[in-house]
């Protein structure tokens, strides 16, 4: 393999497949870069559509609806050494060895179960360490949880123990987000709330039992508030921030 500056040489890449059959297919790839196994009843287009069908739930505004494909498959990938791939195709990306991706898809209930575990990923000087992501979704609901031990952003911001859990039911998303930010002082953030697609092709957000601190000062949000976002901007209703014996009430358009 060659890019504009250098040549790269691979060790043996072993590919085993019976993909000409109509069902019970498998493809197995072994190399010094990664190992990959896909098996079941599938085509590459159906694998793409299985992910697209579920991810469209989170951003379906103005896009063509994708139907759940008829397929049943599982997949496993182990990253060994991505140095050559990164240097040739995406120099800004680095994936640590022993990163694992696995999952399965079933036609029944359009069930997608997806897991990602990685010691670390770096992209454009943004670094994530010890990543554990789980995604479980059916036609009725979806749940995502991820836990990142440490994040260092290109702007110098450092984040410890970033944890997110959310569940999507119909057009309503419920989320619980926690992290600790290290700058000149430490700030702990705890956000609990919801997001709902509105009939006006926008989103309604609300915070519940949410708080954060800046140094020794603690701040809290009221439970009854509304933030509406659409193409026309942002509308805020009854958002109150309490702290240090004072409060700030926000109402209006941004």
Question: What is each residue range found by the language model?
Answer:
Residues 1-254:
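Interface amphipathic segments
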């Amino acid at each position: 393999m060659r890019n504009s500056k250098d040549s790269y040489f691979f060790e043996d890449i072993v590919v085993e497949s019976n993909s000409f059959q109509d069902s019970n297919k498998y493809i197995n790839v072994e190399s010094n870069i990664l190992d990959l196994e896909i098996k079941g009843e599938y085509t590459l287009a159906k694998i793409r559509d299985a992910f697209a069908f579920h991810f469209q739930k989170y951003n379906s505004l103005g896009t063509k609806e994708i139907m759940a494909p008829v397929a049943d498959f599982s997949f496993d990938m182990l990253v060994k050494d991505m140095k050559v791939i990164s240097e040739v195709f995406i120099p800004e990306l680095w994936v640590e060895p022993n990163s694992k991706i696995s999952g399965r898809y079933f036609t029944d209930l359009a069930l997608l179960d997806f897991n990602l575990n990685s010691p670390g990923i770096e992209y454009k000087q943004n670094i994530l360490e010890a990543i554990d992501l789980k995604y479980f979704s059916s036609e009725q609901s979806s749940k995502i949880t991820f836990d990142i031990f440490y994040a260092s952003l290109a702007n110098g911001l450092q984040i410890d123990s970033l944890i997110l859990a959310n569940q999507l039911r119909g057009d309503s998303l419920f989320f619980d987000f926690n992290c600790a930010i290290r700058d000149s002082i430490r700030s702990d953030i705890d956000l609990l709330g919801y997001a709902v697609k509105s009939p006006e092709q926008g989103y309604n957000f609300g915070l519940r039992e949410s708080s954060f601190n800046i140094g020794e000062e603690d701040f809290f949000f009221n439970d009854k508030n509304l933030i509406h976002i659409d193409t026309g901007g942002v509308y805020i209703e009854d958002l109150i921030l309490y702290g240090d014996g004072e409060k700030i009430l926000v109402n209006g358009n941004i």
